[in-house]
């Protein structure tokens, strides 16, 4: 299995009042080109997709435009979005049902199966079931 792992996009970020959307656009274009040439099975975006829990409409549009373009360029590509400390997990999960129809899976909040314990990550084709308690 081949995947691309990325994080800390911080879409919507400004630097000392300077709008960074052009930089973000160039990064996302580069990532789309990489997806087209490398043909990964999955793209994992591990947190801090946005720079703030309440991103601008422009930042959200940039994400959703990217997701649609990425899944159209690489048939069968699965995308996993994981919320970071700058993201609102519930806001990121809000369109999860719609995104799932495009092979985009969102995990914004932690769901525990028990009251603690060691968890192990599971492989396979069940992105809705990513961890289970490790047997004692």
Task: List each model region and its residues.
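Proline-centered loop/turn at the N-terminus of a beta-strand
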Residues: 2, 78-80, 105
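Residue-level detector of flexible, active-site-proximal loop/helix-junction positions
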Residues: 10, 86, 113
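Divalent metal-dependent hydrolysis catalytic cores, especially in the metallo-beta-lactamase
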Residues: 42, 80-83, 133-136
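Conserved catalytic scaffold of divalent metal-dependent phosphoesterases
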Residues: 97-98, 102-136
């Amino acid at each position: 299995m081949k995947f691309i792992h990325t994080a800390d996009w911080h879409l919507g970020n400004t630097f000392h009042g300077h709008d960074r959307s052009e930089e973000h656009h160039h990064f996302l274009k580069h990532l789309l080109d990489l997806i087209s040439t490398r043909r990964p099975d999955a793209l994992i975006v591990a947190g801090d997709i946005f720079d703030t829990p309440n991103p601008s409409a422009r930042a959200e549009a940039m994400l959703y435009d990217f997701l649609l373009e990425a899944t159209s360029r690489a048939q069968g590509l699965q995308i996993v979005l994981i919320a970071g400390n700058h993201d609102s997990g519930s806001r990121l999960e809000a369109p999860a049902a719609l995104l799932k129809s495009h092979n985009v899976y969102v995990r914004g909040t932690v769901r525990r199966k028990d009251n603690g314990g060691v968890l192990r990550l599971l492989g396979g084709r069940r992105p809705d079931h990513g961890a289970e308690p490790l047997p004692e």
